[in-house]
C-alpha cells in the first residue's frame, strides 16, 4: 500500500510540475515573435550591430523595457481570467517597470500577470452576483480600475523593492565568488540571473569595473568572458533545433542566428523559461567556458559587448583566437549535450508510460495504442457504451479532481471512439500545452480530413489545455495530457491519441460523426 501511495503521490507531483511548465509556456510562447522582432532590431541597429542606425536603435530599449514585460503580464493574466485579467495584469505591471526602469522586468511580469489575473477573477466572483441590475457596466469597469490602481501601487512600492533586493543579493554573491577565486562557480549565479534579465546589473555593475581594474594590471581580464560567452545559449538553441517541437523548434533557428552572431542573449531566455530544467544546461555550459578560459589564461582587454561570436573574434588578443574559440565551443557543447538529455528526459518517461499502458490494455483485452480498429469484444460493447455515455461522463466529472490519470481515461473511454454519441457535436478542439505548435498542426490536418469527408459544417480549432472552455464538446489531446484536459472540461467528449498527425482514431471519428449526424 505504501508503495502504491508513493507512486500515486509521485505521479501527482509530476502532473503538477508538468502543469506549471505548461503555464510558463503559455505565458512565454505567444510572445516569442515579439522577442525575435526586438532581437533583430537590437542586433542590427545598435552601435555594435550589423548596420548601426542611431535612430532605429532607439526602438530596442523601450521594447525590452516596456513592450515585452507588458505582453507577458497580459498573457499571464489572460490565462487566469481572460481579457479582463490580462488587461489589469498589464496595467499593474507598469508599477514594477517604472520603479526599476534600468532592468527589464520579465520576472516581475511573470509574477504580476498571474497574481493580478487571479485577483481580478476573485473580485468578479464577489462583485458580479451583488451587482444591481442596470449597473453592470459601472461595477465591472470600476472594480477593474480600482484593482488595477491598487496593484500598480503594490508593484511599485512592494514588489519592485523585492526585485531590487534579489538583484542586490545576486550581485554581492557573484562579487564574493570572484574575490574568492572560485570563478567557475560564478556561473551558478550568473546564468540564472541572465535568464531573469539581471545580466546588465551583474555584467556592468560587477564584471566591468572589476575587469577594468584587472586588465589595467594584467593587460586582460577573464571577467569580461563570464557573462558574455555565447556558448551556453547557442547550445540550448541547437538542442531545440534538433529535439524541440512545434513553435519552439521552428523559431529556434532564427533565435540562434540572433544570439550567436548578433550577441543578443536575451533571445534564448524564453526557451529556458519554458523548460526550467534547462537552467542546469546553461549553468554547466557557463562553468565549462569559465574553467576553459581559466586553464588557458585567456581574457579580453575590453568588455565583449554584445556577446557575439563576431565581437569575440574581434576582441581576441593576437595569437589567442583558438583559445577564444575553444572556450565558446566547449561551453556550447556541454550546454547542448545537457539540454538534449533534458529535452529527451522529459519525453522518454512519458513514452515508457504510454508503452506500458498499451501493453497493459492489450493484456486486459482492450484496444492498444497502435491498433487500427476495435477488437470484437469492444465492438459488442459499443452500443451499450453509447447509451451510458452521458451518465458516465457526468459521474466522472463530479469526481475528476479526485481521480488519477488512469481512472479518468477509463471513465471517459478516451481510446474508444465508438463509445460516444456525436449527435450534437459541431466543434472539435485540439489541445496541447501551449496551444500553438502540435495542436495547430493536428487541427489543420483534421480540418482537411473533414473537408474531404463532407463534414465542413464541423468547426476544428486548437488551444492550450488551460484555456479549454467549460462548454467544450469534443476535445482531442495526446494521451499524456488527457487527464488535465478532462479536469479543465469535464463535460466534453475526450479522445486520446499518441500522435496528433498520425492516428487511426481520426478515421473512426469521421465514420461515427457521419453515422450519428445523418
UniProtKB/Swiss-Prot annotation:
Keyword Cell membrane found: yes
Compositionally biased tracts (Low complexity): 388-398
TM stretches of this protein: 32-53, 58-78, 143-164, 174-194, 282-301, 322-343
Keyword Membrane: yes
Gene Ontology biological-process annotations: phosphoenolpyruvate-dependent sugar phosphotransferase system
Molecular function in Gene Ontology: protein-N(PI)-phosphohistidine-mannitol phosphotransferase system transmembrane transporter activity; protein-phosphocysteine-sugar phosphotransferase activity
Domain PTS EIIB type-2, residue spans: 426-518
A GO-annotated cellular component: plasma membrane
Function: The phosphoenolpyruvate-dependent sugar phosphotransferase system (sugar PTS), a major carbohydrate active transport system, catalyzes the phosphorylation of incoming sugar substrates concomitantly with their translocation across the cell membrane. The enzyme II CmtAB PTS system is involved in D-mannitol transport.
Full protein name: PTS system mannitol-specific EIICB component
Gene name of the encoded protein: mtlA
Amino acid at each position: 500500500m505504501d508503495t502504491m501511495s508513493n507512486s500515486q503521490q509521485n505521479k501527482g507531483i509530476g502532473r503538477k510540475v508538468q502543469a506549471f511548465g505548461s503555464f510558463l509556456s503559455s505565458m512565454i510562447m505567444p510572445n516569442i515573435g515579439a522577442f525575435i522582432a526586438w532581437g533583430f532590431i537590437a542586433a542590427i541597429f545598435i552601435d555594435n550591430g550589423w548596420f548601426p542606425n542611431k535612430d532605429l536603435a532607439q526602438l530596442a530599449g523601450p521594447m525590452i523595457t516596456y513592450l515585452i514585460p507588458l505582453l507577458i503580464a497580459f498573457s499571464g493574466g489572460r490565462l487566469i481570467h481572460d481579457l479582463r485579467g490580462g488587461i489589469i495584469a498589464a496595467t499593474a505591471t507598469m508599477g514594477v517597470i517604472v520603479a526599476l526602469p534600468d532592468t527589464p522586468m520579465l520576472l516581475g511580469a511573470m509574477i504580476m500577470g498571474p497574481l493580478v489575473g487571479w485577483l481580478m477573477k476573485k473580485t468578479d466572483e464577489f462583485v458580479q452576483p451583488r451587482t444591481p441590475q442596470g449597473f453592470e457596466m459601472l461595477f465591472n469597469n470600476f472594480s477593474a480600475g480600482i484593482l488595477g490602481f491598487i496593484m500598480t501601487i503594490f508593484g511599485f512600492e512592494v514588489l519592485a523593492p523585492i526585485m531590487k533586493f534579489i538583484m542586490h543579493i545576486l550581485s554581492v554573491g557573484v562579487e564574493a565568488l570572484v574575490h574568492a577565486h572560485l570563478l567557475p562557480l560564478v556561473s551558478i549565479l550568473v546564468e540564472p540571473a541572465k535568464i531573469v534579465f539581471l545580466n546588465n546589473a551583474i555584467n556592468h555593475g560587477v564584471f566591468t569595473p572589476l575587469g577594468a581594474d584587472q586588465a589595467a594590471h594584467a593587460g586582460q581580464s577573464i571577467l569580461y568572458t563570464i557573462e558574455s560567452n555565447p556558448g551556453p545559449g547557442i547550445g540550448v538553441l541547437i538542442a531545440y533545433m534538433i529535439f524541440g517541437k512545434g513553435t519552439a523548434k521552428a523559431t529556434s533557428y532564427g533565435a540562434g542566428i540572433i544570439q550567436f552572431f548578433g550577441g543578443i542573449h536575451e533571445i534564448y531566455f524564453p526557451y529556458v523559461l519554458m523548460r526550467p530544467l534547462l537552467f542546469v544546461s546553461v549553468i554547466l555550459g557557463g562553468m565549462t567556458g569559465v574553467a576553459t578560459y581559466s586553464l588557458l589564461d585567456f581574457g579580453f582587454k575590453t568588455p565583449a559587448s554584445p556577446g557575439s561570436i563576431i565581437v569575440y573574434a574581434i576582441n581576441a588578443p593576437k595569437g589567442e583566437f583558438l583559445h577564444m574559440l575553444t572556450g565558446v565551443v566547449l561551453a556550447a557543447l556541454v550546454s547542448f549535450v545537457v539540454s538534449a538529455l533534458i529535452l529527451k528526459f522529459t519525453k522518454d518517461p512519458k513514452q515508457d508510460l504510454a508503452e506500458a499502458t498499451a501493453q497493459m490494455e492489450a493484456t486486459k483485452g482492450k484496444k492498444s495504442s497502435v491498433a487500427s480498429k476495435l477488437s470484437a469484444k469492444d465492438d459488442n460493447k459499443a452500443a451499450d457504451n453509447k447509451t451510458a455515455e452521458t451518465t458516465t461522463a457526468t459521474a466522472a466529472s463530479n469526481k475528476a479532481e479526485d481521480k488519477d490519470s488512469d481512472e479518468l481515461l477509463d471513465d471517459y473511454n478516451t481510446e474508444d471512439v465508438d463509445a460516444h454519441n456525436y449527435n450534437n457535436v459541431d466543434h472539435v478542439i485540439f489541445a496541447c500545452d501551449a496551444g500553438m505548435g502540435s495542436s495547430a498542426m493536428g487541427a489543420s490536418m483534421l480540418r482537411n480530413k473533414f473537408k474531404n469527408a463532407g463534414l465542413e459544417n464541423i468547426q476544428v480549432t486548437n488551444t492550450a489545455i488551460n484555456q479549454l472552455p467549460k462548454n467544450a464538446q469534443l476535445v482531442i489531446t495526446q494521451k499524456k495530457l488527457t487527464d488535465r484536459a478532462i479536469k479543465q472540461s469535464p463535460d466534453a467528449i475526450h479522445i486520446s491519441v499518441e500522435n496528433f498527425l498520425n492516428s487511426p482514431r481520426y478515421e473512426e471519428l469521421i465514420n461515427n460523426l457521419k453515422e450519428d449526424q445523418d
